[in-house]
Structure formats: C-alpha cells, structure tokens
Amino acid sequence: KMDSGYTGNIIMPYNEKLSFKNDKKLELEGSLFQTISSHTSGSEILYEKMPITFGSFNLEAKLNVSTSIKAQNIGIDFIKAFDWLIDYNNNKIYVKRNQNSIESVFTRKVMYYAKVKAEKLEIVVKEKSQTKFNLGDEIVSVNRQKVTAENQCELQDLLNRTEDWNSLQLEVISNSK
C-alpha cells in the first residue's frame, strides 16, 4: 500500500523464509519508527541497492525488512519518483517514471540513535553489532556538557548527526539489568 507518512522507500514485514543475495545491509534494533500514537520496537534490516521490479521498471532502491512494522508499504521517497494518475471510474492506476531519484544507498552508517524520552536523552536505536552502549542507556553528558532541559534537543541533534560516537566524549548511565 502507499504510505505517504513513511519517509523511506519500501518496507516489508520480516519473514524467516525471506532470503536475499544482497549482503549490503545494516541491522538495527530498537525504536526506529514513530507512528501517530506510539514508537515501534524491534529489529530492522536495511538493504541498499536492492533490485526492484515495479511494473515495467527495473530499479534499485533501499529496502527495509522489519519485525515491528507488519504492513508492506511503499513510502513517499519511492512514490515521489513517479507521476501517478488514478482512474477511480475504471479502477486503474497509471504510473510514469519522472526525474526524481530513488535513494538506493545509505547516506550514512548508523551506529546509535538518541531521542529525548521523559526528559532524558536515551539511546533508542543501535546497530546490532555495537556493544559499547545498550538500548535505554541514558546519556548524561556530551563532550563534558551536562544534558539539561535547555540543551537536550541540541545535543540529540549533535548525536544523531555524528556517525561515529567514538569521536565524542560521552557519559552514560547504563540501563543493563
């Protein structure tokens, strides 16, 4: 289904029978998506340069295989790459490829992702192989700057723009039980 609220290309639910020859992937766990009423929680496998056949078009796109999203959707980044004409009287859709590009490669590698939750700056997503921090860990300072209500959004942005958190001096309270 078309989902203009999903900013990615193509998403499909995880199924153990799925098998792709593409090893260009990124495995993430945590709360990657926010819906209108909640946050998701699960594992996401993001593939780049996946060959896709869409009608008569052979393309490459990013594909997300998700344990948290249970629908097969095409998102706005994919939708914008086509001109759509919907004929409601005859129940037909006509599609023409336009000049808008379809993202097929990762623009950056995500190791971790932070979000302000309940007035705390928490790690909500991590790349599966990362072991330095855990989901739910609270970040209390960044580069010796204490996280406060006044700067938490600014520090969240800094963290989420930084590909390698090893380049930052972080003080973290572990959530491990």
Each language-model region and where it sits:
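Pepsin/retropepsin-fold aspartyl endopeptidases
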Residues: K1-K177
